[in-house]
Amino acid sequence: MPEKLAMSMVDIKDAGSELRDLESGALDTKSSAADVYYEGVELHRTNEFIDNKPSFFNRIAAALNAETKGIEPVTEDEKNDDSILNAATIWFSANMVIVAYSVGALGPLVFGLNFGQSVLVIIFFNILGLIPVALFSLFGVELGLRQMILSRYLAGNITARFFSLVNVIACVGWCVLNISVSAQLLNMVNEGSGHNCPIWAGCLIIAGGTVLVTFFGYSVVHAYEKWSWVPNFAAFLVIIAQLSRSGKFKGGEWVGGATTAGGVLSFGSSVFGSAAGWATYAADYTVYMPKTTSKYKIFFSVVAGLAFPLFFTMILGAACGMAALNDPTWKSYYDKNAMGGVIYAILVPNSLNGFGQFCCVLLALSTVANNVPGMYTVALSAQALWAPLAKIPRVVWTMAGNAATLGISIPATYYFDGFMENFMDSIGYYLAIYIAIACSEHFIYRRSFSAYNIDDWDNWEHLPIGIAGTAALIAGAFGVALGMCQTYWVGEISRLIGEYGGDIGFELGGSWAFIIYNIVRPLELKYFGR
């Protein structure tokens, strides 16, 4: 009883003190209880009726144990992927495919290089392209941000939206090309019997396999990529054995001069684009790894996971390309069905016949492993493009991306595959601009991960505006236009290199973007403070 009486006296004393404060103006009566109340109501309304109520599609995804998280930062409590191996195998499987194999064949078949020159270009430009992928993978571990959300910090909010749009186009476009190549290879199997797979059905098979994996999200993507390289690697070993038995491989003569230099630069641009193309995806595949994970192990795991399959498949592709130049029959298969035709020529007629066709099917299906990262990232890039689009669940965007890919790939394979290939080559140039801007921001201005306030990920008032990023992007685009060398456009500078020109579009685009960004960015910081 004495204790209760004492507490009551204290309460009365405190109430009297507050009343005197109000009378003397010590408390601000304009921003007291009412404001606190409305803030509490708004917070309650937001948490209860928006954040905590999953959408219809997210409820279905959750029931199927699929990933429901979108572009929101992954908190430390949600990080449950402690496998260093996952950081390597995601890229190991994605590049142990016929797409990378086909890129390697461009050296001898398109750019006129011999085998030795092709190998040197493959090694150097792959290393140049894979380092940014390994670097950006560290950001996912440290910050828990998706790659296109991370771009808001690295390139500015406005510029990041543009990169998100280009990334959506790139994800769909590359998957369309990959499906077209695989559908053509499937179509060649059992061609003489009249029971071969129609091209439309081949496109449907590849797209269907891709959506089955990407629908379930991060965990299933990593689980699939951990083992999908095994049959592909085995099929490539069979190609090596049959190529060796054929005796048609010859290294070719070493020739120098300006024309060869132009071929080296153009082939190098294709190789760089294949390796660096994963840079705008990288952080998406490490965001669930704990912050305490060794950054050195992550970096070198990604490097190894990219380097081996890229070196292996591209060098093998270059060897097969050299062999196709030495055999008119193989060359005719290439002219009709590109590198899928060369694979068929090596494995099937006068070779392994039925087993060779089985290997062709395996390699055609390998495209699923290459398309999976693109169709997972396309959903996140679409959400990062515009706030209302982020309200559409990831699983919906994943299915929409796969549907668009299928819808485009069927007519593209029949009618305009050449246009699609040229268009996607042009899209690839933006990678150098993106890397130049992002690396400038991190290493020159932020310098450490502590300079990133994760809570600002969707705050327009705190994120960099993107003035410097946009200026650098425009300048880089001019550099690309002057340096690119494609069948439909040869830049004024690139045409000066050799007889056919030399592609220096990514070198000029990246360097010009780097220069302009570091001229404008200090001014942006000075006048806007962010």
Swiss-Prot record:
InterPro entries: NCS1, Pur-cyt_permease, Pur-cyt_permease_Fcy2/21/22. GO terms for biological process: cytosine transport; purine-containing compound transmembrane transport. Pfam families: Transp_cyt_pur. Keywords: Membrane, Phosphoprotein, Transmembrane, Transmembrane helix, Transport. It comes from the Eukaryota. The chain crosses the membrane at residues 96-116, 119-139, 162-182, 197-217, 220-240, 263-283, 298-318, 345-365, 372-392, 396-416, 418-438, 463-483. It is found in: Membrane. Signal peptide: none annotated. It is a multi-pass membrane protein. One of its GO terms (molecular function) is nucleobase transmembrane transporter activity. Belongs to the purine-cytosine permease (2.A.39) family. NCBIfam families: ncs1. Probable purine-cytosine permease. This is Purine-cytosine permease FCY22. It comes from Saccharomyces cerevisiae (strain ATCC 204508 / S288c) (Baker's yeast).
